[in-house]
Design a protein with these regions (language model features):
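Canonical Rossmann dinucleotide-binding motif of NAD(H)/NADP(H)-dependent dehydrogenases/reductases
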Residues: 15-57
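The beta1-alpha1 cofactor-binding region of Rossmann-like NAD(H)/NADP(H)-dependent oxidoreductases
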Residues: 82-95, 127
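Conserved NAD(P)H cofactor-binding loop of Rossmann-fold oxidoreductase domains
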Residues: 112-118
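Substrate-binding pocket helix/loop in short-chain dehydrogenase/reductase
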Residues: 120-122, 129-131
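Active-site helix of classical SDR
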Residues: 145, 179-182
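Residue(s) in the substrate-gating loop at a strand-loop-helix junction
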Residues: 164
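SDR active-site lid
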Residues: 196-278
Length: 317
């Protein structure tokens, strides 16, 4: 019996390995539009797909970022400036994409643009602090996606949304985790709706990686500004112990972060060019071995783990 079971498990893994490595043909004819290509994941993915021979349409927030990217890639890659928080900018970029892809349609849409700050305990933040992040990470994703869906549907292509492990486990206050939970929900409904048209939707859920989003200096500067603007009452409740905890978190953040960004961009590439893409990709060992298992744990256990690594307020009961 055990022999049959071992053979069955071996055959299953062999079949899975084979399916994972099947790649689409005619890649040089496929157009992929990527947001947030000024740095980090977006920039690396644009270069990676360009080297693969795909027709990359890279959206950058700044002309400087676009110019740097063009200098590192082939003449096939084209750039456009895009602010995902401005509907007129999104509409102009969508028209630009339509003119480039023509009747072929758009094979791939990668929603990568995102921000992480401001981040702090919820009571220290204002409504505008939440709006700032949601405008980019969630509403921007929705606006770009809805603007380009007709082109993706025409190509029977792929939508790849870059979320985070914090879309599975809420680790801290502020709009970032909320935006990623929202992106997960949007992607789930989108995947089901578009499956009728041959379009596949994938979620990339990285752990901690060393990018501009995890910069210690930017994080500390943002948190200190939030603290300085908070009311005396809130400061008294939270106490300066919170300051020390967040400073320690910032110091440890860069040490926790994985430096190999290709672990993420390889997942994004697979979602775009594999014959059988997954619906969810966990990138990084922390995502696979810690945060993904945590998402299946009972709430009381997840809370206990997070309490263990955080400080209680001065006025806690």
């Amino acid at each position: 019996m055990w022999l049959y079971l071992a053979v069955f498990v071996g055959l299953y893994h062999l079949l899975h390995w084979y399916r994972e490595r099947q790649v689409l043909s005619h890649l040089r004819e496929k157009y992929v539009f990527i947001t947030g290509c000024d740095s980090s994941f977006g920039k690396l993915l644009a270069r990676q797909l360009d080297a693969r021979g795909l027709r990359v349409l890279a959206a950058c927030l700044t002309e400087k970022g676009a110019e740097q990217l063009r200098g590192q890639t082939s003449d096939r890659l084209e750039t456009v400036t895009l602010d995902v928080t401005k509907t007129e900018s999104v509409a102009a970029a969508a028209q630009w994409v339509k003119e480039h892809v023509g009747e072929r349609g758009l094979w791939g849409l990668v929603n990568n643009a995102g921000i992480s700050l401001p981040m702090a305990p919820n009571e220290l933040l204002t409504k505008q602090d939440f709006v700032t992040i949601l405008d980019v990470n969630l509403l921007g994703v929705i606006d770009v996606t809805l603007s380009l869906l007709p082109l993706v549907r025409k190509a029977r292509g792929r939508v790849v949304n870059v979320s985070s492990i914090t879309g599975q486990v809420s680790l801290f206050g502020g709009g970032y985790c909320i935006s990623k939970y929202g992106m997960e929900a949007f992607s789930d409904s989108l995947r089901r709706e578009l499956s009728y048209f041959g379009v596949k939707v994938a979620m990339i859920e990285p752990g901690y990686f060393k990018t501009a989003l995890t910069s210690k200096e930017r994080f500390l500067k943002s948190f200190l500004e939030i603290w300085d603007q908070s009311s005396p009452e809130v400061k008294e409740v939270c106490s300066e112990k919170i300051l020390a905890v967040y400073k320690k978190f910032a110091e440890q953040l860069e040490q926790k972060c994985t430096q190999d960004l290709s672990l993420v961009t390889n997942c994004m590439e697979h979602a775009l060019i594999a014959c059988h893409p997954r619906t969810h990709y966990s990138a990084g060992w922390d995502a696979k071995l810690l945060y993904l298992p945590m998402s299946y744990m009972p709430t009381f256990l997840v809370d206990a783990i997070i309490y263990w690594d955080s400080a209680s307020p001065a006025k806690a009961l």
